[in-house]
Every structure is written in C-alpha cells, then in structure tokens.
C-alpha cells in the first residue's frame, strides 16, 4: 500500500525531529565536554601560575633573609672592628702615658743609675763580644760611664772573658728619648737596644695578654697566651 503524501511528510518530519534532537544532544555533549576541558585547563593554568607566584615569593623571601644575614654579619664585623680599634687606642694611650712617665725615672738620679747599671750589663751579656761600644744620650754620659766601669769586672768574672768596652762620644742617642743605652759589637753590625722606650715596648709586648685580660677580661675564644 503506497504511502500518501501526508504520511511521507509526517515520516520526514519525524526523522528530521529525531536528527535535530540527536544533533542537539551531541552539541550539548560537546559543549559540556568542552566546558569541562576548559575548566580543567583553566584550573591547571591557575594552579601553575599560583605555584609560580609562590615559588617567586619564596625565592624573594630567601633572598631577603640572606641579605638580612649578610647585613647583620657586616654590622657585627664593623662593630667588632670598632671595639678592637677602641681597645688598641686605649692600649696605645696607656703605653704613651707610660713612656711620658719614664722622664720621672730619669729625674731620680739614684734610681736611674741603678737602671743604667742593669741595662749596660745586660747588653754586654747579650752580645758577648771581645769589643763593644755603648751609645747613650750626651747628658747621660757620666752615669753611663759609671755603669760601664761597674759592669766590666762583673762581666769578666761571670764570662771568664776579657772585654774592651768604649762609650761612643762621636754619635749620641737623641736627646728626645727618655734614656737608656744602645750597645754595638766592634764593627757596629750587631746592636742591642736597651733604651727605656725599647725596654718598655718589649715588656708591653710580653705582657700584652695580661694587659688585655686586666682591661677587657679574658678572651673566651683564646686557648693559648702569646
């Protein structure tokens, strides 16, 4: 039985409606999948950017922390150097004051004579030369001459050696120094400096750990004394 035009049109409409419905469902499915993929990609991008931002600020925070440590270390080093300079300045001032007080020793002739006796004899013992030359300040010549005359017999007995000791009257020590003597061997190539300043410097060097300890306290980081 042949279909009428109305039936054909009805079937065509039904098929078109089915195709349209299927197309709409497919389009909705594609849209949903596309939206899902978009949201996933958007979330991935957001997470990636969030991680990048976090890494950036973590790196910046570490850099700032490192800069703080370096700056703090520099400040502590500068402060430590200032303290050391202040301590050195104080010790230098004390030594300068001690050198100025040496003039009081020289003014006491009796005391100074005893000191010169010891300095001359000590210098002779240090050189142990057959011929030695003593140099002094011009104003100390009489005292040094007396010291040499006392030292020679003592030296001979102690060393069992003969010795010729002369006082240099051509070149004297500067008048500006506090006092004391310099003693040379015969050809003046070897010298023992026993001026008051040189003896004070030597004592200061030997006693420096004790001086620092008395002024500033013991150094906890120091295991050995100089």
Swiss-Prot record:
Keywords attached to this entry: Acetylation, Cell membrane, Cytoplasmic vesicle, Hydrogen ion transport, Ion transport, Membrane, Phosphoprotein, Synapse, Transport
Tissue distribution of the protein: Expressed in brain (at protein level).
GO biological process: pH reduction; proton transmembrane transport
Signal peptide: none
Keyword set includes GTP-binding: no
One GO term describing the cellular component: apical plasma membrane
GO molecular function, one term: proton-transporting ATPase activity, rotational mechanism
Family recorded in the similarity comment: Belongs to the V-ATPase E subunit family.
Biological function: Subunit of the V1 complex of vacuolar(H+)-ATPase (V-ATPase), a multisubunit enzyme composed of a peripheral complex (V1) that hydrolyzes ATP and a membrane integral complex (V0) that translocates protons. V-ATPase is responsible for acidifying and maintaining the pH of intracellular compartments and in some cell types, is targeted to the plasma membrane, where it is responsible for acidifying the extracellular environment.
PANTHER family: ATPASE H+-TRANSPORTING V1 SUBUNIT E1A-RELATED
Protein name in the entry: V-type proton ATPase subunit E 1
Gene: ATP6V1E1
